Swiss-Prot record:
Alphabetical UniProt keywords: Amino-acid biosynthesis, Arginine biosynthesis, Cytoplasm, Lyase
Record-level GO cellular component terms: cytosol
Reactions accelerated catalytically: 2-(N(omega)-L-arginino)succinate = fumarate + L-arginine
Protein name per its UniProtKB record: Argininosuccinate lyase
Top-level division of the source organism's lineage: Bacteria
Annotated source species: Streptococcus mutans serotype c (strain ATCC 700610 / UA159)
Length: 460
């Protein structure tokens, strides 16, 4: 049953919304996360209104004091929101009116909820981007420090999840450092498109009042205002960029967690995770499960979904504002909270894990990952590489049938294969030698890994 419409926008209506319809349209359950930013935006707006003589300095001071009181109450957890006021903007105006009286109604002069909500979201995301960039810097530092400790730790390098060539564990970690550095660069670029003020665009066409958009932008800490009022209220690209960047970040974290999950299994035993980041089983007493790594891997799905959700919302929206845009917030909030916690979890998990360097190195001696070394050895002595590749492949087949490895083959047998092979072949086949010799730029050679780490430390 409908009643008389008492909404702040209700002048044009004869009846109010049914309660269940009102609840469907309300967003206060989630957009209250914007409360602090809504108040800060309003403080900047009313300061400008007073400075420009659009409202009296006395009224501006009264409104500003009321807003500052509400901000303190919000930070103290004392504000209560009402679903009948729909969203954070109407709730704040209602609370302000209750605090200072009808003069609160002057706050909305030369402003619409359209530019107001866009401003709130720019402020929120700008703050979150700073937090994400800082946490990424911490994770990258953890990786560099861990890599520095394990420059000389040898592990199997993989292709197709099969042993390929021995590499430095530090080199492996630095590959992830590079991924997370690119993530950081993307978020830093994201700041550029977030650092714009929509305030003053009003509903879509600007306003007849002599406002100063540069002033409010400066008061809120933005680089500049949007140059087009339609774009200002309808643009959500900055959120889509954030969700896209977050999806790539989660993909990188998921890939790393997948490896950590494998490394701490009985089959690998490369690392041991701290109890802080592990859980047990309700039935199997022996279990120590890498749940936090699995959760990061799993949560990548929800972050991807948030990106696709907003892309779908935006794909057919005409200019300028549409109620569909209410659906831009929950995914943004969820993604921001997910990646900030995941970054802390991954950094903590990596910094506290124990690396079984001896077992890592031993695993490179129980495979044929030194096969390329033998082929390169022959090629370096003048044999065409393709011929060397063929010879080594046949020798591996022979070794596989006889149950031994290349380093176990007697010199006499080697010399029946090629008189180019001498005693020094055994040094070549050692994993440490194989890694050390790969000194091409960006390679896994120890000096190259040290150089990568030194460059990373400069960047950090």
């Amino acid at each position: 049953m409908t009643t008389k419409n008492h909404k702040l926008w209700g002048g044009r209506f004869e009846a109010g919304l049914a309660q269940w319809v009102e609840e469907f349209g309300a967003s206060i359950s989630f957009d209250q996360k914007l409360a602090e930013f809504d108040l800060k935006g309003s403080i900047a707006h009313v300061t400008m209104l007073g400075e420009k003589g659009i409202i009296s300095q006395e009224d501006a001071a009264t409104i500003k004091a009321g807003l500052e009181d509400l901000l303190e109450e919000y930070k103290a957890g004392q504000l209560k929101f009402d679903v009948s006021n729909e969203d954070i903007h109407m709730n704040m105006e209602s609370l302000l009116t209750a605090k200072i009286g009808p003069v609160a109604g002057k706050l909305h002069t030369a402003r619409s909820r359209n530019d107001q909500v866009a401003t709130d979201m720019h402020l929120y995301l700008k703050a979150k981007l700073d937090e994400v960039i800082e946490k990424l810097a911490n994770l990258r530092t953890v990786l560099v420090d861990l890599a520095d400790k394990h420059v000389h730790t040898i592990m199997p390098g993989y292709t197709h999840l099969q042993h390929a060539q021995p590499i430095s564990f530090g080199h492996h970690l630095m590959a992830y450092y590079n991924m997370f550095t690119r993530d950081s660069e993307r978020f830093i670029f994201n700041v550029k498109h977030t650092d714009l003020s929509p305030l003053g665009a009003a509903a879509l066409a600007g306003t007849t009042f002599p406002i100063d958009r540069e002033m409010t932008a400066q008061l809120m800490g933005f680089a500049e205002p949007y140059s087009n009022s339609l774009d200002a209220v309808s643009d959500r690209d900055f959120i889509l960029e954030f969700l896209s960047n977050a999806s790539i970040l989660m993909m990188h974290m998921s890939r790393m967690c997948e490896e950590v999950i494998s490394w701490c299994s009985h089959e690998y035993q490369f690392v041991t995770l701290s109890d802080t980041f592990s859980t047990g089983s309700s039935i199997m007493p022996q279990k120590k499960n890498p749940d936090m790594a699995e959760l990061i891997r799993g949560k990548s799905g929800r972050v991807y979904a948030n990106l696709f959700g907003l892309l779908t919302v935006m794909k057919a929206l005409p200019l300028a504002y549409n109620k569909d845009l209410q659906e831009d917030k929950e995914g943004m909030f969820d993604t921001a909270e997910t990646i900030t916690v995941a970054l802390d979890i991954l950094a903590g998990m990596l910094s506290s894990m124990i690396v079984n360097d001896k077992h890592m190195a031993e695993s490179t001696q129980k495979d044929f990952s030194n096969a390329t070394e033998l082929a390169d050895y022959l090629a370096s002595k003048g044999m065409p590489f393709r011929q060397a590749h063929e010879i080594v492949g046949k020798l591996i087949l022979e070794c596989s049938k006889n149950g031994h490895y290349l380093q176990d083959v007697p010199l006499e047998r080697y010399q029946t294969i090629s008189d180019l092979i001498e005693e020094d072949v055994y040094e070549t086949l050692k994993s440490h030698t194989a890694v050390e010799r790969r000194h091409s730029l960006g390679g896994t050679g120890f000096e190259q890994v040290k150089w990568q780490i030194a460059e990373a430390k400069k960047a950090l």
